[in-house]
């Protein structure tokens, strides 16, 4: 009762990385609240394939739902699992990834339980809250932190009166860290029929087409990112050449995306992707806090900027003062001459 729950998203027999990130955060939240961490795994044929890995993130109790109709994912069965399990277990917090599945499942569950949900969170904390209108004081609420108004402000949202406190969290904003390979958690193999009525299986997935992503920003060891200072689409072509030489990926600031220099899929920051490369080369990026929030955990940051006072230089390990057009071709030339 009143524990922290994490819904683990599973693609066939593979637990998605965002779920491990949430288990890590869930463990920390549970420790702070003095409660247990529980996880939910639902799929087809997953018994014996996912339990040990999930438990290793510090899960005290894992609820496994294994049935033919639970994979590929469809809305109704998974909604019924969470709604009925939560009515039984009464969790105080539920976390899931801000993925295609999480954005479908989360609102359905929160609506059924009239609990409310904060979507696309970038941080989660535990804290107190004083309701000035009612005069009530609340201990140990979940601070659900997310960008608002196009990323221009950061909002902290609380849910004092309804449970569970639900949030979806963007992939990559939290680190996944195991507690112990042999963590001694309990596994409960649930009777799916008790939670899911037969009518929920009316929709079946006949065929799935999975398209390969155009980039791998989240997993790239080297990222060459461009900002408004790159100046044009042609400037981004230059960054792509450098990224290709370094076997890295190209990213962008919101200003560059808004200017039409590149596509939104490359955007890094609070309203884009969060990355942790070994090397981050910031080209013509001023360093707005919204952008820095998405790359601040990079290993080495190299800033190329005409403005020596640019905010990005405050967090950079190396600063090169100059234009992208002047500096990047020298990078490419030097690498070609010295990488053989």
Segments the model singles out, each with a brief description of its role:
Residues 1-340:
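N-terminal glycine-rich FAD/FM-binding segment characteristic of electron-transfer flavoproteins
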């Amino acid at each position: 009762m009143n524990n922290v729950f994490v819904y683990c998203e599973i693609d066939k027999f593979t637990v998605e990385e965002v779920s491990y990130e949430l288990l890590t955060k869930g463990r920390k939240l549970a420790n702070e609240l003095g409660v247990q961490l529980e996880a939910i795994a639902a799929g087809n044929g997953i018994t014996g394939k996912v339990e040990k890995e999930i438990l290793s993130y510090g899960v005290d109790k894992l609820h496994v739902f294994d049935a033919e109709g639970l994979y590929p994912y469809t809305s109704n069965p998974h909604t019924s699992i969470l709604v009925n399990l939560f009515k039984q277990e009464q969790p105080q917090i539920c976390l899931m990834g801000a993925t295609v599945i999480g954005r479908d499942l989360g609102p359905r569950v929160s609506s059924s339980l009239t609990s409310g949900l904060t979507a696309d969170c970038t941080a989660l904390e535990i804290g107190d809250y004083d309701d000035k209108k009612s005069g009530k004081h609340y201990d140990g609420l979940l601070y659900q932190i997310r960008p608002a108004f196009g990323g221009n402000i950061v909002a902290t949202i609380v849910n004092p009166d309804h449970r569970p406190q639900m949030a979806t969290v963007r992939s990559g904003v939290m680190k996944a860290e195991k507690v112990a390979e042999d963590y001694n958690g309990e596994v409960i193999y649930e009777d799916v029929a008790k939670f899911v009525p037969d009518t929920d299986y009316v929709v079946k997935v006949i065929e799935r087409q999975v398209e390969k992503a155009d980039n791998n920003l989240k997993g790239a060891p080297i990222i060459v990112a461009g900002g408004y200072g790159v100046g044009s689409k042609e400037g981004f072509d230059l960054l792509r050449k450098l990224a290709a030489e370094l076997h890295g990926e190209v990213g962008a600031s919101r200003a560059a995306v808004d200017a039409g220099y590149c596509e939104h899929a490359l955007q890094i920051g609070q309203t884009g992707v969060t990355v942790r490369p070994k090397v981050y080369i910031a080209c013509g990026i001023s360093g707005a806090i919204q952008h820095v929030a998405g790359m601040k955990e990079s290993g080495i940051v190299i800033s190329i900027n005409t403005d020596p006072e640019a905010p990005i230089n405050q967090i950079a390990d190396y600063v090169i003062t100059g234009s992208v057009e002047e500096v990047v071709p020298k990078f490419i030339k030097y690498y070609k001459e010295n990488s053989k």
